[in-house]
Regions:
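C-terminal peripheral helix-coil segments that are non-catalytic and often amphipathic
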Residues: 1-8, 86, 90, 97, ...
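Basic, helix-initiating cap at the start of DNA-binding domains
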Residues: 1-32, 36-45, 62
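Short hydrophobic/aromatic patch on the recognition helix
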Residues: 47-57
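Amphipathic alpha-helical segments used for helix-helix packing
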Residues: 67-68, 98-120
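Short, basic, alpha-helical segments at the C-terminal edge of helix-turn-helix-like DNA-binding modules
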Residues: 68-75
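Hydrophobic alpha-helical connector segments
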Residues: 76-102, 155
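Amphipathic alpha-helical packing segments from all-alpha helical-bundle domains
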Residues: 97, 118-143, 153-154
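Hydrophobic alpha-helical segments that form the core
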Residues: 148-168, 180-186
């Protein structure tokens, strides 16, 4: 066996172990909330030692963040051939569903309790997605679907904050009707009319 084959086998084993651990986090969160989540239980469910988990993640909050990222890896892709309104509606609906799942709810707890974790989530997860949304906004301006003279950063903050607000304070997942109305009202001041 060549060194390259050995390396590939080790890489594959590492990837499989990580997947088992992340699956174990999902399983555990289906039974207990974040405060009762333990590395011992996750290790037992995944069939690995605690040291294996700590080799890749320092804290259980890191595990929850990684699990959320894995669960939503392909969920938030934008469709650049479709309208800004369509894309924002789809993103907010998918975010609502993702945050209402066990890993999403645990992540909300982590962010409320840990400023550093919240900052990491913002930098590593939200900023790249926001950058994609900025590109879509620019494309929508170029297509003359929306006006350019608007504070889009604040608009995005308001849209996403409304979803978090519904989930955290009202313990409800915004439905399609709510999201459609939210996006329509938010975009109304900047939509280009055919007569413009």
């Amino acid at each position: 066996m060549t060194a390259a084959n050995i390396f590939m086998n080790e890489t594959e084993k590492t990837s499989k172990r990580k997947q088992c651990i992340l699956r174990a986090v999902n399983e555990a969160l289906a039974e207990v909330d974040y405060s009762k989540l333990s590395i011992e239980d996750i290790a037992s469910r995944a069939g690995v030692g605690k040291s294996t988990i700590y080799r890749w993640w320092k804290h259980k909050s890191d595990l929850v963040f990684e699990t959320f990222k894995e669960n939503t890896a392909s969920v938030f892709e934008l469709e650049f051939d479709k309208s800004l309104q369509y894309n924002l509606s789809q993103q907010l609906l998918k975010l609502s569903m993702a945050l209402n799942q066990q890993a999403g709810r645990a992540l909300l707890v982590v962010m409320a309790e840990n400023r550093e974790a919240a900052g990491d989530f913002f930098k590593q997860y939200l900023l790249p997605r926001r950058e994609q949304t900025r590109k879509l906004i620019q494309l929508s301006i170029e297509r003359q679907e929306i006006r350019a003279d608007y504070d889009f950063e604040t608009m995005l903050d308001m849209l996403y904050a409304a979803v978090h607000y519904q989930i955290i304070f009202f313990n409800c997942v915004p439905d399609e009707a709510y999201v459609e109305k939210l996006v329509t009202v938010s975009l109304a001041p900047i939509m280009m009319n055919k007569a413009d």
